[in-house]
A protein has these predicted regions:
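Hydrophobic residues embedded in beta-strands of well-ordered beta-sheets
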Residues: 54, 121, 135-136, 218
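Short, charged N-terminal beta->alpha structural module
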Residues: 1-33
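Generic beta-strand structural signal
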Residues: 49, 116, 130-131, 213
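A short, Trp-centered hydrophobic/proline-enriched beta-strand micro-motif
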Residues: 103-118, 154-158
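Charged, gly/pro-rich active-site loop segments
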Residues: 42-43, 47-95, 168-239
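A short mixed-secondary-structure module that forms the rim of ligand-binding clefts
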Residues: 36, 129-163
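Short, basic/aromatic recognition patches
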Residues: 87-111
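Short active-site oxyanion
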Residues: 3-4, 44, 132-136
């Protein structure tokens, strides 16, 4: 695991907190308590205070210095630094990773679906089903559709109850929600896969809406992968 040390001046600690949380796998030190032994750290970031705002220097052999203008710019910079400092470790072959993700989804049936627009966000627990390898939810509606209709962007998570780091298992997904026309063949196939006939559907007090989740990025965290020589965190980017 690549650990990053962040050394900060007291007047710039909020910038350090933002960097440390977004980058991840960081340890933060006030300047007066900076470690003398750097052998346990793959990277170092210093955050100093100046009259014009925080000054950030990132890297060991190759250093980059910049002055973030505001918290939004700090967050954006932290995301880029995180990608540079924390490249994928011991990745699985793509086909093997796809099979692992498929097996994980087949072994579960409930996800947490996050949608949002502007400063408004919503996270809803939902049962899901898979039809021809695609991921769907059926729902009577609700505020989650506010975000779906606004921008379609979704994030979803499927996970086991925590029982220790060795057995830790969860899947984060990012993608787009697509509303399925209730008059389409696709809608009919999803309803039938759920075990509901159209005649039964017509007798229900409220309509069932079908939404397809087109996933562009999977992030699998599976502690059991270490036994096979792979990193616990694996990423499958389809976007």
């Amino acid at each position: 695991m690549n650990i990053t040390a962040i050394i900060y001046d007291a007047d710039a600690r909020r910038t350090a907190y933002i960097l440390g949380t977004v980058i991840g796998n960081c340890k933060l030190f006030p300047a007066e308590r900076a470690p003398r032994d750097w052998s346990g750290y793959a990277n170092v970031i210093t955050v100093t205070a100046s009259e014009d705002g925080p000054v950030v220097t990132a890297g060991l052999q190759k250093r980059v210095t910049f002055r973030p203008k505001g918290e939004d710019e700090t967050v954006a910079a932290a995301e880029l630094i995180g990608k540079a400092f924390c490249p994928p470790e011991a990745p699985m072959p793509t086909d093997a990773l796809k099979a692992r993700i498929d097996a994980f989804l087949e072994a579960h049936n409930t996800l947490a679906l996050a949608t949002g627009c502007g400063k408004w966000v919503r996270c809803t627990p939902l049962e899901y089903l898979r039809v021809d390898g695609r991921l769907y939810i059926l729902t009577e509606g609700g505020l989650k559709f506010k975000g779906i209709w606004w921008n379609g962007a979704i994030s979803a998570a499927v996970f086991d109850s925590y029982a220790g780091m060795a057995s830790l298992a969860g899947l984060q997904m990012t993608g787009t929600a697509v509303y399925i026309d209730p008059l389409s063949d696709e809608y009919r196939s999803v309803i039938e896969a759920r075990g509901v006939q159209l005649q039964q559907l017509q007798q229900m007090p409220a309509m069932l809406h079908a939404v397809r989740l087109d996933i562009t990025r999977y992030e699998l965290l599976d502690g059991a992968l270490r036994a096979d020589g792979y990193a616990a965190r694996q990423v499958l980017d389809l976007g």
